[in-house]
């Protein structure tokens, strides 16, 4: 199954699961007018095809006192050390997103911290990585929205 093999039923099932991954298949089936078995089989096919990679929780980090979000551009001294640096960054729990980029920086990451002192500590930890030549930090003053599943609304079937 490829993206082009999704039909309207698959897309509607995805819409329900994107809204709430814990929606029972029977509830999805009832709302769609199909059997729960059909929902189960189609979800399994989308999982097998790698379209559905699992389910996850959305955590409100502000409720856990992680109120400070910073984006960090990382310039490496040697670009052939990118994978090595990514592994090190992956080991820092406050680094919540990592991307290899073109342009001014080799790597771009998102960090969540409790406050400016916590963010400073994490940025210093990143700067201490041997292959890191320099970093540039951008403080998020407001997260307007964060929706990793938003694109599904634009996928055409």
Task: Please provide the spans of the model-predicted regions.
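A compositional/biophysical signature of low hydrophobicity enriched in polar/charged and small residues
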Residues: 1-157
